[in-house]
Amino acid sequence: MAPVPIYVKGGIWTNLEDQILKAAVQKYGTHAWSKVASLLQKKNARQCQSRWNEFLNPSLNFKPFSQQEDDKLLDLAKRIPNQWKSIGEMMGRPAQTCIDRYNILLAIDKDDLELAATTGVQIGEINPNNESLPAKADKDELLDEEREMLAEARARLLNTQGKKATRKIRERMLEESKRVAFLQKRRELKQAGVDSKIKAPRKKYSSQMDYNEDIAYEQQPLPGIYDTSKEDEQTEKLLKSFEKLVERKGLLDRKSDEKKTIPQKRRQGEQITSSVTKLDSVLTDEYKKPKLELTPATLKGSKRKINKTTSILHLFESLPSPKNDFEIVLDDLDEEMESTDAFNTESSYVNGKYPLEALISSTEHQSENKAMEIMEYIPTVFQIKTELQVPSPIVDPKNEIDRELNRIISAKENGNPIYNSTEVNNYLEEIINSASTTEVPSTVLHPKLETSLKTITPATEHELLGMERKVHELRTALEDSVKSHREAVSQLSQDFEEKLHPTVSGLAYQYYTDYMKYRNDHKTMQEETQSLAEQIKLAQRSQ
């Protein structure tokens, strides 16, 4: 096993760590630095807090000090000496910036009173004030550990659920996976021929309700005056058949059930029937009415067509004789219909049966007579066209449409004029009058549209191909002219990123370090010169 690398917490901050720190502060706030530091591999909680308070806080002021701020800084340093965090909060600046500015303003003995400056660092030493320096620039590609740290921080910061909700979701998923595994095992056992039932879950407390067996807030109906034992048997039968179906095939598997035929279903239902024995009290049985027994159905098996007229007549015959002493006075139309019906029924009644053909012929004869009385024929101008072929007449007409067609065909063959009813003639005349009065819209085009259509000539296929060829040539020429410039620009940018930028950054850092060394040496030389001048003056005075 490879040795685990030991990281030293600290070092200069990178841009990636700054961005992760900002996002973590937005989520966890400025009081949970241990959670913030858990997202950064090379920083601890104190360093994260110092980095935020000294560099990344948007409320900090990094502008140059003014004269009023210098006076305020000196005043605060006298009032609360060595409490630079409090002074920085009062000034609205980082504590290290206030220390650096105070060291610049003071011109006293370095060994006694001067505080540690941020720039007094030699090459190779650990800078204790990395939190107040700008972040290091990102590299072209992130390292593996940085990429892993970024992925973990993104996953944790995007998670908006708490620990309890996450645990509940994990437990729910675990229960669902257990249930699916149990159902799969039960299905495999059923295929192997081993029947296993689903056990009820263990109750957490004694009064817990099992909603698969019991019904919440169920209220049993009070016994009534009617006997409902047959309905109870039917309900019990349906319940048992449903439980058996669920036990054998499942709750949602109904495709195979739809393919069953009716006799198979009936046979299966007869096998499941079971009598329900019930102890009824004597008191309730005395007040119950007997069961309603209906006559059994006369038609069983295949269905056949029933004539409405014969069924109505049979129903009238089955009615009992009236018990009233008065006679029912019918209207004239009802009396005529009754007389005709009585005549037809007497003539058609043979050996206690009503033939279907006699009833149909009587109804057709009545409808034909009624239609002939209502219709009044008048000559009309509409005739069958001579070029059309006359169809053959219908041998056995069944309705008015067939009879009307036979009448028109016979009139055409005999050369007689064809008559229509007054209603049809009036309707046709209205259609002709409405068609003659309608105005037909003009199809003349607008003059401007007509001139534009005449002047514009569509381009031919040869012209379109020529235009497409020219566009392609211009595009290739433009790409060739830009290609050399694009390569030069990419080469320059690559040289700048690989060579010039690192060199300039190193030179700038070296210049900054040398300049700070020179400034410290110059300050030391000035102090030594002043001390020598004072000693010379004292020597001259003593002489």
Curated annotation (Swiss-Prot):
Record key words, sorted: Coiled coil, Cytoplasm, DNA-binding, mRNA processing, mRNA splicing, Nucleus, Repeat, Spliceosome
Domain of life: Eukaryota
GO biological process: mRNA splicing, via spliceosome
Domain HTH myb-type: 1-58
The keyword Repeat is assigned to this record: yes
Matches recorded under Pfam families: Myb_DNA-bind_6
InterPro entries assigned: CDC5L/Cef1, Homeodomain-like_sf, Myb_dom, SANT/Myb, SANT_CDC5L_II
Coiled coil: 135-188, 459-541
Myb-like domain mapped to chain residues: 59-106
Region (Disordered): 256-275
MF GO annotations: DNA binding
Localisation per UniProt entry: Cytoplasm; Nucleus
Entry's Gene Ontology cellular component terms: cytoplasm; Prp19 complex; spliceosomal complex
Ranges of the DNA-binding region feature: 33-56
Subunit organization: Associated with the spliceosome.
Function: Involved in pre-mRNA splicing and cell cycle control.
Family: Belongs to the CEF1 family.
Protein's name according to its UniProt entry: Pre-mRNA-splicing factor CEF1
Annotated source species: Kluyveromyces lactis (strain ATCC 8585 / CBS 2359 / DSM 70799 / NBRC 1267 / NRRL Y-1140 / WM37)
